[in-house]
């Protein structure tokens, strides 16, 4: 797996740019026998590709921004509770189907496993999310 032209993104980051990308709509490609890129029919998961890109760029943090304040235990039920922090092990025990927070949790865990800070929360609370004041933070283990 690779991100074509990642060197351009690395250059932008090295110059101090904030890189916002992998928001969906990417074009999946493979390399043909002549090492040329060729489009294929496939789906690119924006959360997983964002975690992959963040690792490739050596990012300190991965914020997965959405329209809900946090990951919820029992989402959609009267007993729903927002989760402020989850360990990787705890996240695996949650029942989060693919159409819900499942891919975001998988991506956040992947990045956290590599030693990075990962969090899921509202776009409007991105700064608070980054500082640990909002959303759900995925950690290797509780401290």
List PLM regions with ranges.
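C-terminal catalytic "cap/lid" subdomain
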Residues: 1-143
